[in-house]
Amino acid sequence: MNKVFKNSWALFLGMGAIMLAYGYQNALLGVRAVIEEFSLASTGFMMSGYFVGYFIGARTIPSVISGVGHIRVFAAFASIASLAILVHSIFVNPLTWFLLRVITGYSMVSIFTIAESWLNDLSLIHI
């Protein structure tokens, strides 16, 4: 058990930080939408973009991972997700935010998929 924890603590810590940061971003986008006086319909539309990207990513990410590799895909989509979050402050438009949320959803599902596959690889080694 100690060996498994010793080999996987960084993965859990990193994923915890990513999930915490995404949770803050998700909550603060709703607050920012109210401050910018978006309508309720446009706020709902904008926030639903995450799930559109998540659905598309869940269907396509396995082929991307098998084509390029886990580490490259993780690094690329972690960078893309952080860039999309930063661009929200530059463009204050519900349609732009919807597209950025699609990108964020696609990136997050790829990060989650890769972390899960790394965890599965670690558990298979130590069984």
What is each of the regions a protein language model found here?
Residues R72-L86:
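Structural signature of the two symmetry-related core transmembrane helices
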Residues I90-V92:
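Helix-breaking motifs and short loop linkers at transmembrane-helix boundaries and internal kinks
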Residues M19, G23, G105-T113:
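Small-residue-rich segments within alpha-helical transmembrane domains of MFS-like 12-TM solute carriers
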Residues I125-I127:
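Conserved small/polar residues in nucleotide/adenosyl-binding loops
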Residues G57-G69:
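Helix-to-loop junctions at the C-terminal end of transmembrane segments
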